[in-house]
Each structure stands twice: as structure tokens, then as C-alpha cells.
């Protein structure tokens, strides 16, 4: 009998610590605030927490520019606070994984400060330093994914250092064994403390082509921005844009050395009992043989559509599950998500501005995430229908990607400053990182009245988009989340069962079975605002209702009627 691990059966909940809960009243979320909300998370019905970066950082890239891998940012608390948070989570049966940024450090990390101090410093080779071309200019034509050259000149020493992201985030040299040893020591530090694993940020960027050849497809800054702009505005198919970007960065991402590091990291993690590695990638190759690299990679293709449809979901599942099975029938496992701290919020991304439809589509998106085969990942605030909030003043921006987008739209697309600001607010990531909305109270209950929060609070907390108000309403989105999470927890087939598609030509609804040795469940998701009557040719006509978004009577599987946007889950008997 197959034994499933906790990371296969869990529902993960991502906490963006700066925006989750302000425990000390300074306008910034912190560990004390998170600890005060652990009972809420337990009652919600999730099983594991993914904590976005909590390390000391200058915050140029919102914590993904790490200045100390074994510390806690002072605005979030202390190491003792972290230990109390971890203990509190474990006491409630909640696992905890940490974000781990392996590719680069902050330019203020002591390692880089030492590295740039002289060519003879022992840490010089911890980063990627090169001389420029004989006639001047950077070593090659590579670009940063955030625009401009990937090489930054240091006039004090007369060499360039490489950065795939912002120049404030110099890449580590993973070909240096001392770098791997130092980073693995940080991993051991947190594992020894008891964390349950890591989400590995930007894992495909650890290595570059060793010869540093010029890229034949290297874009100009304008080319890069236009490709990025096309992606976020959906003016071209996602696969077309992805192929173009892959060509642009062909020597900078997904190089062979990554697999060796992941195998070594997996061996380290496997020295500890029951820990997990999740990669910020959708590349199934990073499972290795299914048991020697990452435990989970994300099914990012699932979210790369403007509108969720049955055809999209079917095609995604067929492709992903077939690819996983090609690695190994059991060792690889899907990680399903529709939202995180880098992309539009689910309610805004899949909605169309009509309140009733948007609410129904938000419920369908959760149902899809929780009923497909794999481990679901939710993002804080999804459960109350938090929406993107567009900032109206560039001085409020905290995401430097948004600042770059504003400048690029003026320079490359010749937008007027007002239009560039509007577009940058939509393209940047601040919109999905605003403070969690806990109550219909000043600052949405995130911070005390009169405190300026690190990002502005979305004012729709006063229109019912808050935890306290929705807890008191049985039909609210929050209580829907709680009900559906409970239904999943009580249905073994929904957690570990196979996925069997049904009615594969149906344009308006998605139907499939989830089945294991203990149970077979029928799932029907009606994605459109019209009713349907459906006949199922199944071995049994009897079913026990497990969950429905609508009131229902007894069902005969030979002829089932579904209301507009209905979510239906039944156990075949």
C-alpha cells in the first residue's frame, strides 16, 4: 500500500509576513502578529504554512535580497520570536516551510561587502566577477531579467559582477564549494531548529554558462520590456512569450549544474525526518528521478490564462500528469496554485468586474485547486476575496519592479507619465501585497488606528472584504473556504486519489473522478452562468453528496442538473 507523505496530503497557506498581521503597531507585519493568528489558520483548515522571507534585508526587492541567512529581520522580531512562532505552529499541527533564496544575496550582505573590497579577498570568488571586454563594456551581452545589463561595473576594483535580478542582488558563484558549504550550513541551521522544509526561490538561475558566451537572442532593454509587457497584458499566448524569454536567457537559466546542487541539497534534507523541498519552477526535470531532487514543483501553467475554462484545466492536467508519470509513477507529485505574492490576486485575475460573477469564479478557482490531483497552495487573503489595489502615487510603491515598469513605459512605449503610473500599478506586485484585512476597523484591523501601514490598505475592507465580517456570515467566501477545506480533509480520494477525466468534450463544465482504494469521488465544476443537465455513465447511479455550492436534494447519477457556477462533489456508493 502506498504511503503518502505530509507534503502530499497538506494544504499550504502562504504568509507574506510584512502584510499578514502587525503585532507591535508599527505598520509592518511581524512574527508576533502571525502568532496571534495561528488559531485562525488552524480553524481555516490548512495544514502547512509557507513563510515568505523573514531574514534581515534592505528590502530593495521586498526581502528577496537577503543580508543574513540565519537571522530574523528586526522589524519582524527576534530569533526567539521565530522559535515561539514555530513552536506555536507545531503545537497546532501546522507545518512550516521557509522561503530560501539561493541564487543571490543582497549587495549589503557581509559576504558581498568582503568580496568587493579587493581582488585578493578570500570571498572574491564567492560571486561572479569578470573583466570587461578589451575595448570596454561588460563581459558579454547578457541582460538582467529586470532590465539593463546583467553586469554592474565596480570602479573601485575595475571589474564587473553578475546579477540576474537587480544590481542590488549579486549572484552567488555556486561553482565555488565554499559557497555551497556556507549556504548548506544555513539550511542546517533552520532544519536543526525544526522547520519542515523550504520553498526554493528562483532555483533555475543558480548557474550560468561557464564560458559566458554572448547570447544570439539577447534583447535590448526595449525588447525585454515589450516581451514582459506582452505577457502581463496577455496580448500574445503565454507559450509564445515563454519561448521568447527562454531564448533571451538561454545561457543564464536552467544550466546543468543546478541538478547537482539539488541532489546534494536533497541528500542533506533527507538526513532529517520528513522534510520537504518545494521549487519555484514549473520544470518537472527538477524532480530528478522523482526521489533525489525536489519534492514538489509548482503547476504554474495552470494560472497562465485570463479565464479558467474546462478545456484549459483538462489540457493542463493531461500535460502535467503525463509529464510527471514519465519521471516516475509515484516519486513526483504536483503542486497546484492559482496565486501568490508575484501575480494578480485570484479574485482580480479571473474575475471580470461583476461582483456576483467574480465571487462565483473565486469559489470555482478554489474548488479547482483543492480537487485536482496534487498539493494545493493558497495565498493569504484569497479566502476573503482580497482584490488587487492599484496605487495612485509612485511614492507609495515599495516594489522596485513597478518603479522600473513606470520608467520603462515612459521611455520605451512613450506613455504619458499619468498613464505610465496607472499601468505600472497594474503591472507591479504591490497590488497583491497589501495588508491583510482582518476587520471593518481602522487599517482593516491590520494595524492600530492612526498608524501608517507599509503599503496602503485596500479600502474595500469596509465593504465586507474582511475576516471578522465574513466569519459572521454563513454564506461568505471565507466560510465557503472553511467548508470546502473540511470536505477535502474528510475525503481520502480528493487528497491522494487518481485523476480520471470525464466528458472531455464538454465546453462549459469540468467533470472528473478522484479515486483511491477507499473511495471514489465525482467532481463537477460548472464554469458558466447557465444551468446544465448531465448524464453520467458510471457503474453506479447512487451517490452521497459531500459538498455543493448550492442546495440540492437526492441525486441520480444517470441524470444530474447543475446550477450556474455550481461546485458539486459526491462519493459514489
Q: At which residue positions do the language-model features occur?
A:
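Extended, hydrophobic alpha-helical segments in both membrane/secreted and soluble proteins
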Residues: 198-203, 365
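C-terminal beta-strand-rich structural cap/linker in extracellular carbohydrate-active enzymes
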Residues: 556-573
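Acidic/aromatic-lined carbohydrate-recognition and catalytic surfaces
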Residues: 2-188, 192, 204-282, 436, ...
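Short glycine-biased active-site loop of nucleotidyltransferases that positions the nucleotide triphosphate
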Residues: 59-63, 287-292, 513-514, 560
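Beta-strand-rich binding/interaction modules
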Residues: 531-551
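Loop/helix patches that line or flank the sugar-binding groove of alpha-linked glycan CAZymes
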Residues: 6-8, 211-250, 260-272, 276, ...
